[in-house]
């Protein structure tokens, strides 16, 4: 099965050159409701710590998506339903990430909680109520996050998008304790440094500690990318076609096709 992503020709060029897909932070997507509400007793805004790549499973052309993301002049990328390089964690869990634990400038990300899975959006009457349920107390000052459902709720009016998503979850960390361990000890122990970082995870998320990273890029599987299908938008020009054909030259098995609406929509400028 293929999945589909509507985007600009410029973005297609970046994807083909880098052979990566960009996951954008949830508090920067078009639907502000996905990130403005807090979750659980801590009222944590999980959109700061969730990164998404948005697709649709529907092979039927969606005029709303053509308009929203390309103004009818971009492309629709069609690719295998699992387009990324994946990494097996155990017999039951396959991750989008290779490393059990890696660090950004102010966050930690782990293969253990980032499943290689395409999550279907749930369209609901009250997204705020659903988002509120995503965090529960654990012990005195700990929290448990329902990670599989984070970033999966939108208001019913968005249902026209028929959206599915890949997701990445990061954990904010306070580097202060680790830095003190490194700077104040003559022979700092790696274990102690890591413990300082781990100790900061729960409090950092509960206090809505901001992170600076706005996107994360993940490698596409080159075998899947080689078989990519590109549909030209209804209002693309002959010059646009020439550009797309040039971009796909390194991918001889890729295919180009026209929108069923080609020549059937009026360009209003």
Name each model feature, range by range.
Residues 1-269:
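Catalytic-core loop-and-flanking beta/alpha module that positions acidic residues
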């Amino acid at each position: 099965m293929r999945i589909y992503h509507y985007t600009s020709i410029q973005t297609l060029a970046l994807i083909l050159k880098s052979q990566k897909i960009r996951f954008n932070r949830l508090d920067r997507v078009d639907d502000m409701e996905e990130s403005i509400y807090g979750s659980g007793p801590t009222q944590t805004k999980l959109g700061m710590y969730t990164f998404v790549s948005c697709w649709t499973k529907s092979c039927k052309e969606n005029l709303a998506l053509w308009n929203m993301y390309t103004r009818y002049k971009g492309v629709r990328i069609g690719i295998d339903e699992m387009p990324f390089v994946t990494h097996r964690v155990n017999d039951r869990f396959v991750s989008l990430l290779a490393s059990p634990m890696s660090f950004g400038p102010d966050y930690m990300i782990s293969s253990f909680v980032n499943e290689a899975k395409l999550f279907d959006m749930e369209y609901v009457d009250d997204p705020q109520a659903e988002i509120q349920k995503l965090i529960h107390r654990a012990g005195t000052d700990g929290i448990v996050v329902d990670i599989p459902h984070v970033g999966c709720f939108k208001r019913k009016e968005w249902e026209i998008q028929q959206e599915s998503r890949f997701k990445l979850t990061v954990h904010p960390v306070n580097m202060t304790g680790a830095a003190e361990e490194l700077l104040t000890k003559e022979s700092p122990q790696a274990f102690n440094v890591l413990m300082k970082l781990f100790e900061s995870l729960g409090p950092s998320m509960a206090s809505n500690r901001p992170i600076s990273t706005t996107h994360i890029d993940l490698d596409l599987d080159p075998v899947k990318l080689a078989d990519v299908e590109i549909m030209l938008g209804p209002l693309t020009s002959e010059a646009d076609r020439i550009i797309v054909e040039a971009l796909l030259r390194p991918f001889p098995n890729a295919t180009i096709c026209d929108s069923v609406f080609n020549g059937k929509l009026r360009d209003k400028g």
